[in-house]
């Protein structure tokens, strides 16, 4: 084969071509979770509540928006997947849904974005763990097989915000069950895992990750103080009051201390970190929202974490799809000029 190639291309070109042919595909490359986090840097949550999944013709988010995200200074998208609604009685994923997911993943990868596949049926799982468990196992068995040859820019996240019935002990047991399902087809793919109690920092010290699995990225979500970040949110009756501001020295020091606690855990466990969600709801004062968002992003960056803002569209928005423009104060807070 080498002589034939030399005759066509010359000796140096032939050797280069053979080397390229012999190189492992992108999917076979092993990237450490630390290096993965260094490439992820700034991210944003997308597509959790978009009509795309049920009827692509009604989608608000368009594939071109991945270029908007990349051009906007982001390197990662966290896809919020409510997959259970697209499973049959046998827990098989709908082929049409998988086709849509493939299109989304391919469009994001084409923009050189890291893609986190985040299984987002956290409410269902928290309310009824017994019903959730076989679905979640089936989901990761199918997704693991489906994406086993995907580039290393595709990252898995076992479950968003385990809560309620998914106590620390239950969730840790599920982690020990789910990871082997993933590893059967994706032995070195990086997987995001966070603690119970809605990925809250207060439960990070209860998170039990298998010491032998060194392809894990730990995650937490940060919305403290809730009376500020969720003020006026209809789904959270505990925070009905509006007009709450943020930005005092004491509030900033509280955030720093919270992040320092996470960093101490990360160093002790030798795990890289993803701040998988943060932000402040739209009913808050914009100046305070921008200040909070900027502070959280900079604190994460200062500690070498990747982050993903909540979210591109729907609420807490960073981008106005109707006007096809970034919400300037939020975008500037996330990606300073």
Residue ranges and their predicted role:
Residues 1-13:
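Bacterial N-terminal signal peptides that target proteins for export
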Residues 285-337:
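Aromatic-rich peripheral "rim/lid" segments of glycoside hydrolase catalytic domains that contact
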Residues 10-22:
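Hydrophobic helical h-region of N-terminal Sec-dependent signal peptides
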Residues 96, 133-136, 208-212, 235-237, ...:
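Short, hinge-like loop/turn segments at secondary-structure boundaries
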Residues 31-190, 195-205, 215, 316, ...:
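Active-site mouth of glycoside hydrolases
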Residues 132, 254-255:
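Alpha-helical scaffold elements lining the catalytic groove of polysaccharide deacetylases
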Residues 137-251, 257-280, 302-308:
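Active-site region of glycoside hydrolase catalytic domains
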């Amino acid at each position: 084969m080498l002589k034939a190639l030399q005759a066509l291309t010359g000796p140096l070109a032939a050797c280069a071509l053979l080397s390229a042919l012999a190189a492992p595909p992108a999917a076979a490359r092993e990237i450490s979770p630390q290096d993965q986090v260094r490439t992820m840097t700034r991210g944003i949550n997308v597509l959790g509540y978009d009509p795309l999944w049920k009827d692509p013709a009604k989608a608000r988010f368009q594939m071109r928006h991945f270029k908007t995200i990349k051009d906007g200074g982001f390197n990662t998208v966290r896809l919020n997947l409510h997959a259970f609604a697209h499973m049959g009685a046998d827990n098989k994923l709908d082929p049409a849904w998988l086709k849509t997911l493939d299109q989304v993943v391919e469009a994001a990868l084409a923009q050189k974005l890291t893609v986190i596949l985040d299984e987002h049926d956290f409410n269902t799982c928290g309310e009824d763990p017994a019903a959730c468990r076989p679905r979640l196992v089936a989901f990761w068995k199918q997704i693991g097989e489906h994406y086993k040859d995907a580039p290393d820019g595709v990252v898995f996240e076992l479950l968003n915000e385990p809560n309620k019935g998914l106590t620390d002990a239950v969730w840790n047991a599920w982690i020990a069950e789910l990871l082997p399902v993933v590893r059967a087809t994706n032995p070195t793919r990086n997987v995001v895992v966070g603690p119970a109690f809605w990925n809250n920092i207060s439960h990070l010290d209860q998170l039990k990750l298998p010491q032998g699995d060194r392809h894990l990225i730990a995650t937490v979500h940060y919305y403290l103080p809730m009376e500020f970040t969720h003020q006026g949110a209809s789904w959270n009756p505990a925070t009905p009051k509006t007009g709450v501001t943020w930005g005092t020295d004491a509030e900033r020091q509280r955030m720093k201390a919270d992040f320092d606690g996470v960093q101490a855990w990360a160093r002790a466990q030798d795990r890289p970190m993803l701040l998988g969600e943060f932000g402040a709801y739209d009913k808050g004062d914009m100046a305070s929202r921008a200040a909070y968002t900027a502070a959280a992003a900079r604190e994460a960056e200062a500690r070498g974490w990747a982050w993903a803002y909540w979210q591109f569209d729907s609420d807490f928005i960073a981008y106005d799809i109707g006007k096809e423009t970034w919400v300037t104060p939020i975008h500037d807070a996330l990606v300073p000029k």
